[in-house]
Curated annotation (Swiss-Prot):
Export adapter involved in nuclear export of spliced and unspliced mRNA. Gene3D superfamilies: 3.30.70.330. SMART domains: FoP_duplication, RRM. Residues 1-50, 241-292 are annotated as: Disordered. InterPro entries: ALYREF_mRNA_export (IPR051229), FoP_C (IPR025715), Nucleotide-bd_a/b_plait_sf (IPR012677), RBD_domain_sf (IPR035979), RRM_dom (IPR000504). PROSITE patterns: RRM. This is THO complex subunit 4B.
Length: 292
């Protein structure tokens, strides 16, 4: 105790200061320090393991590389899937397209049935390409990938499709008779209908009176002029009550409705031929149409 009192303040501070080990290799601390990595003096407690410590995180967590790549991959719609992928996924028919594809079907399609289950797409191509150019062809498969025994072939030209039907219909392929029918036809543009002459109906009741009564059997005594009397005889029949030729053919105004009274006396009828009557009738028809 007395020794401590005799020591100076600096010596007391130096004696109470705990020796610190260095973090470098082979620390400089006193005591039993063995100089390991991050070691400290014997009085500084157990050494820490810094191997598992990492730097400060910039994010709360990190995703696995594989999961991140799968998440960042571009999503693709089924619209952009190929025919082969759709057929493999849903089991539809496999179709081979010859040449560039088109969204509009322009060829003539044949439907082939009663095929042997061992017939392949190459067999169909080899068989029907001998007739003409093919746009596409294919065997129909079910969901399990087995052939349904049917196929379809699309020819570029309709004439080739008809020739294929005549050549291969009811012909054996691998021991079975093929049944071929046309299901896709090229419909030519419909021909324009022949325009008939326009039929203009005559007015039945207009400013000229009852046209049917005047010309369809009942001649009212007025034919671009006034007849004598109130005749209602038929145009081709015998007049009644004065009728045809009951007065003079005077060039006055024709009456409306039933025949008016003629302005002439009892003279002889003028000789009128059939041609004159036809001409007058045509003229009256023309005036009736212009008036209406």
């Amino acid at each position: 105790m007395s020794g401590g009192l005799d020591m100076s303040l600096d010596d007391i501070i130096k004696s109470n200061r705990k020796p610190t080990g260095s973090r470098g290799r082979g620390g400089i601390g006193g005591g039993n320090n063995t100089g390991g990595r991050g070691g400290s003096g014997s009085n500084s407690g157990p050494s820490r393991r810094f191997a598992n410590r990492v730097g400060a995180r910039t994010a709360p967590y990190s995703r696995p590389i594989q999961q991140q790549q799968a998440h960042d991959a571009m999503w693709q719609n089924d619209v952009f899937a190929t025919d082969a992928s759709v057929a493999a996924a849903f089991g539809h028919h496999q179709t081979a397209v010859v040449g560039g594809g088109s969204s509009i079907e322009t060829g003539t399609k044949l439907y082939i049935s009663n095929l042997d289950y061992g017939v392949s797409n190459e067999d169909i191509k080899e068989l029907f390409s001998e007739v003409g150019d093919l746009k596409r062809y294919g065997i129909h498969y079910d969901r399990s990938g087995r052939s349904k025994g049917t196929a379809e072939v699309v020819f570029s030209r309709r004439g080739d499709a008809l020739a294929a039907v005549k050549r291969y219909n009811n012909v054996q392929l691998d021991g079975k008779l093929m049944k071929i029918e046309i299901v896709g036809t090229n419909l030519s543009a419909p021909a324009l209908p022949i325009l008939a002459t326009a039929q203009i109906p005559f007015p039945t009741n207009g400013i000229l009176g009852n046209f049917n009564e005047n010309f369809n059997g009942n001649f009212n005594g007025n034919f671009n002029g006034n007849f004598r009397g109130r005749g209602r005889g038929g145009f081709m029949g015998r007049p009644r009550g004065g009728g045809f030729g009951g007065g003079n053919f005077r060039g006055g105004r024709g009456a409306r409705g039933r025949g008016g009274r003629g302005s002439g006396g009892r003279g002889r009828d003028e000789n009128v031929s059939a041609e004159d009557l036809d001409a007058e009738l045509d003229k009256y028809h023309k005036e009736a149409m212009e008036t209406s």
